[in-house]
């Protein structure tokens, strides 16, 4: 079996909650585009924004501005609907991540059940691929979900790390192992593996140390921490934490 090549791990930052803070009072401040510029300055390599059906935080105009003016690739989080596909066709983001969406939820509560909605997802996945948009599916780290993603032809999956982050520290090793197995299976299937949801300074290192995971997407924690420490220092600290977690992998791969 060929040795796994250890790839640089990208940091994508979700800026939804910059818009949440703006919308709490109305107006234009704080501006998600300005946040995206600071993310680039701090070492982030992508910006994620979720345009929800109810437009509770990010707006259509935000998506248009981010695509037109942000120096980083835009990862457009979207429900698998005809409306969102039409917006993606108009805006042409670098990537689109399909996520489940419920009006009553505060945040995304689980991964997309690709097994159950595989047929409904197919025209959305194909439509995004037709505009050269990199498609990812936000899924729980389960073999059946990965197999369904492969059948759909999705080139990327993002593993839902929420259960790992919310589990008591004494039981977290089992959830980390579950993520590792899923990442290995994804790679064996030829699917690029990302991860995210609920990660913070305490929980990111072990996930960043999974060799097959080449991108982490982190949002709420970084936006909250930036209120106290500033955007650039917060992003830079997370970037360094990820690099430290990957360093032993790179060293081992050279030996």
Describe the role of every protein-language-model region.
Residues 51-127, 145, 159-162, 179-185:
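N-terminal active-site wall of soluble small-molecule enzyme domains
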Residues 67, 110, 171-172, 225-248:
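C-terminal helical cap(s) of enzyme catalytic domains, especially alpha/beta-barrels
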Residues 97-105, 156-168, 212-231:
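Glycine-rich phosphate-binding active-site loops on the catalytic face of alpha/beta enzymes
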Residues 1-77, 81-93, 148-151, 174:
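Conserved N-terminal beta1-alpha1 strand-loop-helix module at the mouth
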Residues 134-189:
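Histidine/lysine/aspartate-rich catalytic loop segments that bind and position anionic ligands
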Residues 14-32, 73-80, 107-115, 129-141, ...:
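Active-site mouth loops of central-metabolism enzymes
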Residues 82-91, 142-152, 195, 199-213:
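Catalytic cores of alpha/beta
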Residues 9-15, 47-49, 74-78, 96-98, ...:
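Hydrophobic faces of well-ordered beta-strands that scaffold small-molecule active sites
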């Amino acid at each position: 079996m060929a040795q796994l090549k250890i790839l640089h791990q990208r940091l994508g930052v979700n800026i939804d909650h910059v818009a949440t803070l703006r919308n709490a009072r109305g107006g234009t401040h704080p501006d998600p585009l300005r946040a995206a510029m600071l993310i680039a300055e701090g070492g982030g390599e992508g910006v994620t924004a979720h345009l929800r059906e109810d437009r509770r935080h990010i707006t259509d105009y935000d998506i248009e501005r981010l695509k037109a003016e942000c120096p980083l690739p835009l990862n457009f989080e979207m429900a698998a609907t005809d409306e969102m596909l039409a917006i993606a066709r108009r805006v042409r983001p670098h990537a689109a991540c399909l996520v489940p969406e419920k009006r009553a939820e505060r945040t995304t509560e689980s991964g997309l059940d690709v097994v159950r909605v595989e047929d409904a997802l197919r025209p959305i996945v194909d439509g995004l691929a037709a505009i050269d948009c990199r498609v990812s599916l936000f899924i729980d780290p389960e073999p059946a979900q990965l197999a369904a993603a492969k059948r759909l032809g999705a080139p990327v999956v993002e593993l839902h790390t929420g259960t790992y982050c919310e589990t008591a520290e004494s039981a977290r090793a089992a959830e980390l192992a579950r993520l590792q197995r899923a990442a290995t299976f994804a790679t064996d299937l030829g699917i690029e593996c990302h991860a995210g949801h609920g990660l913070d300074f305490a929980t990111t290192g072990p996930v960043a140390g999974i060799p097959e995971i080449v991108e982490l997407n982190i949002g709420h924690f970084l936006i909250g921490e930036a209120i106290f420490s500033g955007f650039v220092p917060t992003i830079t600290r997370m970037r360094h934490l990820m690099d430290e977690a990957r360093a032993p992998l790179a060293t081992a791969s050279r030996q």
